[in-house]
Amino acid sequence: PKFLDEVKTLKMGDPLREETRLGPMIDEQSAQRIESWVTEAVNEGAVLSYGGGRKGTLYEPTILTKTTPQMKVNTNELFAPAVTVSKHDTFEEAVRRINDSAYGLQASVFTNNIRHVFYAYEHLEVGGVIVNDVPSFRADNMPYGGVKDSGVGREGVRYAMEEMTEPKLLVLNLS
C-alpha cells in the first residue's frame, strides 16, 4: 500500500514545470510500445493494479501484479514508468527471478537487512545495485552501465572521455 500511495502522488506533465515528476516518453512509438506490452500482459492474466493510461507521449505510472516470467513486461527493458511487482517466498528466489533475464542494467533492492544487501551485490547479474532508491540513480562520477544484453562499457565523465577519444601511439627509433 505504501508503494501504491507514493506512485499515486507522481505528477505527470510538462517536464519544465517544477511540480512535474513524470514527463513524456521519448516519442509516440515508445509510448505505444509500453501501452501494448501492458495490454498484452493484462490479456495474458496480469493484474493492472494502477495506471496504464496514455495521452500522447505521456504514459501514466503503472503497476502490474501477477505477471509471469515469460511476459514482455518481464523479459524486456521497459524504459517506461511501469513496474511489475512479484511476491517470492525468499529473497534468494527473488534474485534468481531477476537474473532470469537477458538484461542487467541496474537493480534496486529495498531492504534494511544488510545480509540481503550483500547477497544482492554478490548474486545479481547487473551493472550496479542501488539500495533503497530507484535503479536509475546515478552520479556523474559513478560508472553507469549494464551487463548481458544491456550493453558493454560504462557511462560517466571518466568513462565517457575514454569512450569518446581514440588513443594513438607513436614509437620513434632514432638509431
Place the predicted regions along the sequence by residue.
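ALDH superfamily catalytic-core signature
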Residues: 1-69, 131
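Conserved C-terminal structural/oligomerization subdomain of aldehyde/semialdehyde dehydrogenase
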Residues: 8-12, 55-175
